[in-house]
């Protein structure tokens, strides 16, 4: 846009500022306390599945692409992808397609330096594995699997689980849990990705088992500065057994993490602040990103969390619970 010089400094300056106003992007800081509204359950597992859970979501070409874990009536795990949809209200009618391979607790993102989509997951041929594709909407169009991480952790009944992958300008980072009160990290040069992180890792958070249980996710905060440049959420188990999320922040992906909204009564997201009436559990999911790439960027002005919940009256074994998707939207 071209601006013409005008006489009369006050009037011309006012017009100039008004003209510029629409081009100024508002920036929001992460809140110190969180309060949400919630949808009802958004989709029901198709016949043969008892649960849809462990969601990963990207928005590409204006549509949500969601992958998830499934369980059957015996508690066996598998994985699936939804047909791409524009609005959360469309999720119920979106197709549900089983993957021809088991990609449990998936992480989906676009690796921009190599122009390739990556699907990472657990319980493949390595501790964590990945596949690549040019079209993530083709649920069974993925490459053969490759090793993402080969390390083993001790002091865990599950082993390493619930990975997430994120990158900055120079490195890619792998974060994961172990149902044991610890969060772990591994890293590699971004130039070597996609590839294996190898077997080395470090323990970056340690606490009570129920306080740092599983489902770790890490994000770049759009416009974030200082200690709030990066956001981590970790699933915890509350005093009555219900699941909720605690949050942590950091100034760098390779740095130290500081607790932010980390108590059961003032969590990042949980029964205390979710606004959900159909579930008492806010469990394994993914913040909606404003960029599908490896930076895992979220907009603090428009935070939404795709999560798994279930009917509070269902008291089955964890792997038989009827988990379904719901979405939280942060109150502004």
Swiss-Prot record:
Entry keyword Signal: yes
Keyword entries, A-Z: Carbohydrate metabolism, Glycosidase, Hydrolase, Polysaccharide degradation, Secreted, Signal, Xylan degradation
Induction: Mainly expressed when grown on xylan and much less on L-arabitol, L-arabinose and D-xylose. Expression is under the control of the carbon catabolite repressor creA.
GO cellular component terms, A-Z: extracellular region
Highest taxon listed in the record's lineage: Eukaryota
Pfam family, one: Glyco_hydro_62
Molecular functions per Gene Ontology: alpha-L-arabinofuranosidase activity
Biological process annotations from GO: L-arabinose metabolic process; xylan catabolic process
Protein function: Alpha-L-arabinofuranosidase involved in the hydrolysis of xylan, a major structural heterogeneous polysaccharide found in plant biomass representing the second most abundant polysaccharide in the biosphere, after cellulose. Releases L-arabinose from arabinoxylan.
Name used for this protein in its record: Alpha-L-arabinofuranosidase axhA
Natural source organism: Aspergillus niger
Phylogenetic classification of the source organism: Eukaryota, Fungi, Dikarya, Ascomycota, Pezizomycotina
């Amino acid at each position: 846009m071209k601006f013409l010089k005008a006489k009369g400094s006050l009037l011309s300056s006012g017009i100039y500022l008004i003209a510029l106003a629409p081009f100024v992007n508002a920036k929001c800081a992460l809140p110190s306390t969180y309060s949400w509204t919630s949808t009802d359950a958004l989709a029901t597992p198709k016949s043969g599945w008892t649960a849809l859970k462990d969601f990963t979501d990207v928005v590409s070409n204006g549509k949500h692409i969601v992958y998830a874990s499934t369980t059957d009536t015996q508690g066996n795990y598998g994985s699936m992808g939804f047909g791409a949809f524009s609005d959360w209200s469309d999720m119920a009618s979106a197709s549900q397609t089983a993957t021809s391979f088991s990609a449990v607790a998936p992480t989906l993102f676009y690796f921009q330096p190599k122009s390739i989509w990556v699907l990472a997951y657990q319980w493949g041929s390595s501790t964590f594995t990945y596949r690549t594709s040019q079209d993530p909407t083709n649920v069974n169009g993925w490459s053969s699997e490759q090793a993402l991480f080969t390390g083993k952790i001790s002091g865990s009944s599950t082993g390493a689980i619930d990975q997430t992958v994120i990158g900055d300008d120079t490195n890619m980072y792998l974060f994961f849990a172990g149902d044991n009160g610890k969060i772990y990290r591994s890293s590699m040069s971004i130039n070597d990705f996609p590839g294996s992180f190898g077997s080395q890792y470090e323990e970056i958070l340690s606490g009570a088992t129920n306080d740092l249980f599983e489902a770790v996710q890490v994000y770049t905060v759009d416009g974030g500065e200082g200690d709030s440049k990066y956001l981590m959420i970790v699933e915890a188990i509350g005093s009555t057994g219900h699941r909720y999320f605690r949050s942590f922040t950091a100034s760098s992906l390779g740095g130290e993490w500081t607790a932010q909204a980390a108590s059961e009564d003032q969590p990042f997201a949980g029964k205390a602040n979710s606004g959900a009436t159909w579930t008492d559990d806010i469990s394994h999911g993914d913040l909606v990103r404003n960029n599908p790439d490896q930076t895992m960027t979220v907009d603090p002005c428009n935070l939404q969390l795709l999560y798994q919940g279930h009917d509070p009256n269902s008291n089955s074994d964890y792997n038989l619970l009827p988990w379904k998707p719901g979405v939280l939207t942060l109150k502004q």
